[in-house]
């Protein structure tokens, strides 16, 4: 297995890179700012400069990677087109390139509540709408996929067990980014994770379960 992580310098993306490196899985990290990436990513990660909005740069970044993990997201800005460009157009470009390269598994970090049009987050330039459109594009692509919809993302880790459920079943809760990274990486080797949307939060009240059981329980 060789992984290409896109959105690798974001808060979730860098944790995905770290998780892959810890497991000795070779990583190519697609980054826009090489100097910044060198500061925050493990030296073991191979850094490739590119941009999901420049399709010609994506294929070279994926290269011989067998799996792609996408954790892109628009930076906070006043650009009303940012979610459309990054969450939809960029992901679409990435899916097309992954398909062309024969990638075996595509993991997308999305969000809870993407199916709720009137969710307050859609006040921010319809961000959830475009994430949902990206999900649907992946599902129709023919690629083997896992779509991970985390709850509110927290930078600090905790020991709370993960709660995993199917699409449009969890509507509140939060989860540490490190746990989201673990879910994404575990999905690569769990047959039960293939072609599923999984919603994830963490909860002190939940019971510990194996990864196999967590993914298997999602219909």
Where are these regions (language model features)?
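Conserved cofactor-binding/catalytic machinery of classical short-chain dehydrogenase/reductase
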Residues: 54, 90, 134, 176-179
């Amino acid at each position: 297995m060789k992984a290409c992580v896109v959105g690798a310098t974001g808060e979730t993306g860098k944790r995905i890179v770290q998780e892959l490196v810890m497991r000795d899985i070779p990583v190519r990290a697609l980054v826009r700012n090489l100097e910044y990436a060198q500061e925050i990513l493990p030296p073991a990660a191979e850094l490739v400069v590119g941009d999901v909005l420049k399709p010609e740069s994506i294929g070279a970044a994926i290269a011989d990677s067998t799996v792609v993990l996408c954790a892109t997201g628009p930076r906070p800005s006043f650009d009303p087109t940012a979610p459309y460009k990054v969450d939809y157009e960029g992901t679409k470009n990435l899916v097309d390139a992954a398909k062309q390269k024969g990638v075996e598994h595509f993991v997308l970090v999305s969000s809870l509540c993407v199916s709720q049009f009137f969710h307050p987050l859609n006040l921010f330039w319809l961000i959830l709408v475009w994430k949902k459109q990206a999900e649907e594009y992946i599902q129709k692509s023919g690629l083997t996929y896992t779509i991970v919809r985390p709850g509110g993302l927290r930078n600090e880790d905790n020991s709370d067990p993960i709660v995993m459920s199917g699409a449009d079943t969890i509507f509140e809760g939060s989860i540490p980014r490190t746990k989201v990274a673990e879910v994404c990486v575990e999905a690569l080797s769990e047959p039960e994770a293939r072609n599923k949307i999984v919603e994830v939060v963490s909860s002190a009240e939940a019971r510990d379960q194996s990864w196999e059981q967590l993914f298997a329980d999602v219909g």
